């Protein structure tokens, strides 16, 4: 019995990891869009208000609004009732939360790039988009890595929130097993150890990335 429950926990851990990775990828994409739009003179202010709203709301509220509100919003716009899956809504909600904070990190990293980089690109006849993607962004990721790493660790722990909307993640599985066994300390403890293991492995990976991204700076010193 114990081994069966333990197998379910590890399966749920894979679901949690998949949820976190999907949210990270979508969140990075959204955070870049948010950072660019906030710098735009036409939509900058509304975008700033939207990001501030995401940052100001409790994260569980964002998850619930996305899960219950997405169906109502689509029905309002199209007149059709479409029920969205809990996993997809969880990914979207966590991505929005991640992007609200990561966009500020990216925005600061973009502003840290010397204007001479843009001017050099223009002098070489490169378009602004080419300069941004191929010259500016590689440097932006290096500057933003410490902040983004912290947000990734927060995101890993925030995945526990989606258990409330029915995603079969680690916390949801721990709840179900505890209901059957009445051993909360055992199963929540195992869940905590799995979260801790993933976090520690992530920290090692982040450290290696930081060393790789700064190898040229360390070589100059």
From Swiss-Prot:
Q: Which InterPro entries match?
A: AA_ABC_transptr_permease_3TM, ABC_transp_permease_HisMQ, MetI-like, MetI-like_sf
UniProt GO molecular function: transmembrane transporter activity
| Statement: the UniProt record of this protein carries the keyword NADP | no
Do you know which PROSITE patterns this protein is assigned to?
ABC_TM1
Q: Which residue intervals define the domain ABC transmembrane type-1 in the entry?
A: 13-206
User: Biological process (GO) annotations?
Assistant: amino acid transport
Provide the topology term for how it sits in the membrane.
Multi-pass membrane protein
Q: Which UniProt keywords apply?
A: Amino-acid transport, Cell inner membrane, Cell membrane, Membrane, Transmembrane, Transmembrane helix, Transport
An annotated GO cellular component: plasma membrane
List all membrane-crossing ranges.
Answer: 17-37, 49-69, 82-102, 121-141, 186-206
Instruction: Tell me where on the tree of life, at the top rank, the source sits.
Output: Bacteria
Question: Where does the UniProt annotation locate this protein?
Answer: Cell inner membrane
The record describes its quaternary structure and partners as:
The complex is composed of two ATP-binding proteins (ArtP), two transmembrane proteins (ArtM and ArtQ) and a solute-binding protein (ArtI).
User: What biological function has been recorded for the protein in this entry?
Assistant: Part of the ABC transporter complex ArtPIQM involved in arginine transport. Probably responsible for the translocation of the substrate across the membrane.
- What is the protein's given name? Arginine ABC transporter permease protein ArtQ
Species of origin reads Haemophilus influenzae (strain ATCC 51907 / DSM 11121 / KW20 / Rd)
Name the lineage.
Bacteria, Pseudomonadati, Pseudomonadota, Gammaproteobacteria, Pasteurellales
